[in-house]
């Protein structure tokens, strides 16, 4: 099973999300920055690497938020792991997306997210009242 890691980066009450480019898989869908874990790589290390590649930042992972399995039609199951990133060196730059956007948490459901992220978005937005630090 492929493991995919994603970063929830919040600043000033907004969350950083990226929109995929039009020519690849799942064109123009929104997602949290991150990517696939390579063989023999730990998930946290993969996320640090992916954030450097996609955003040009050196991130410090604060902890895992949640994980679950998902299967896109006709594809193998994947394990999605979402991490909270509270600090990073550098200013996020768009090195890999069609566009980057800082979005208020309550506005996330209005974006056309990857199917694999939709349940997390609902859960994350619903947590605000119960767990304001996540």
Residue map of PLM features:
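NUDIX/MutT-family hydrolases
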Residues: 84, 93-124
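Generic C-terminal helix-cap and adjacent flexible tail
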Residues: 125-134
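Conserved Nudix-box catalytic region and its N-terminal flanking loop in Nudix hydrolases
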Residues: 14-53, 57
């Amino acid at each position: 099973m492929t493991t995919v890691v994603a970063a929830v980066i919040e600043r000033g009450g907004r969350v950083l999300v990226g929109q995929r480019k039009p020519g690849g898989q799942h064109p123009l869908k929104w997602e949290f920055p991150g990517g696939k874990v390579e063989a023999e790589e730990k998930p946290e290390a993969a996320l640090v690497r992916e954030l450097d590649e996609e955003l040009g930042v050196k991130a410090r992972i604060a902890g895992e938020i949640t994980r679950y399995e998902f299967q896109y039609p006709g594809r193998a199951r994947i394990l999605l792991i979402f991490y909270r990133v509270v600090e990073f060196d550098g200013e996020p730059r768009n090195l890999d997306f069609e566009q980057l956007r800082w979005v208020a948490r309550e506005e996330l459901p209005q974006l056309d997210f990857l199917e694999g992220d939709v349940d997390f978005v609902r859960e994350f937005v619903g947590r605000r009242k119960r767990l304001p630090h996540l």
